Amino acid sequence: MEKPKYKRIVLKLSGEALAGEQGNGINPTVIQSIAKQVKEIAELEVEVAVVVGGGNLWRGKTGSDLGMDRATADYMGMLATVMNSLALQDSLETLGIQSRVQTSIEMRQVAEPYIRRKAIRHLEKKRVVIFAAGTGNPYFSTDTTAALRAAEIEADVILMAKNNVDGVYNADPRKDESAVKYESLSYLDVLKDGLEVMDSTASSLCMDNDIPLIVFSIMEEGNIKRAVIGESIGTIVRGK
């Protein structure tokens, strides 16, 4: 059995990753594939926490751009992440992996409220913990949620699984054929050069708490495990 490099991780999934090629909604085949990859690392005795975005169902910024109150639009986005989290939980439990959804906004009929000590206890019992509803506050992204929860639970690394790119580039590789992929970066590089890794709030939080970040593609099956056992994939961001 491969030896994992990291004991406790936060896996950040974009909402789009759950939509697959259809671009929106929840694709059952894709979410089952992701659940199988999570099962692989759970079987290595890695403690797994997951933060899921909601962009496949709703984006707060889009609503705001269309004239909605920004806070209302963001709360709708938080509810979208709960839907995604419940779908992922169902897929994991179909595969026999015990999991818990914890929400930043209380909705006790469908999930536990977020309690840090309880989340850590679940992880110690090798249950997958899915953090839903963002930070519970408008104006904060799910990237910031991943950084915040990683700091709170003292995760060893954040694995940022992308569905449309396999690392961090100096330009958009979909538009610029000469774009170069970085093997490694510092958070100061990300902030200084305005690289689209995660928003500046999330990057600053990771930098201040010395949490490394690996950006990689979720589209190639087995990549989550490769990242966990320390294979060189994607781009690693760390330090100042």
UniProtKB/Swiss-Prot annotation:
Domain of life per record: Bacteria
Transmembrane intervals: none
Keywords: Allosteric enzyme, ATP-binding, Cytoplasm, Kinase, Nucleotide-binding, Pyrimidine biosynthesis, Transferase
Main location: cytoplasm
EC number(s) per entry: 2.7.4.22
GO MF annotations in UniProt: ATP binding; UMP kinase activity
Functional pathway: Pyrimidine metabolism; CTP biosynthesis via de novo pathway; UDP from UMP (UMPK route): step 1/1
Region span, Involved in allosteric activation by GTP: 20-25
Chain positions recorded as ATP binding sites: 12-15, 55, 59, 163, 169, 172
Top-rank EC class of the record's enzyme: transferase
GO cellular component, one term: cytoplasm
Known function: Catalyzes the reversible phosphorylation of UMP to UDP, with ATP or dATP as the most efficient phosphate donors. Is also able to phosphorylate 5-fluoro-UMP and 6-aza-UMP.
Family per record: Belongs to the UMP kinase family.
UniProt name for this protein: Uridylate kinase
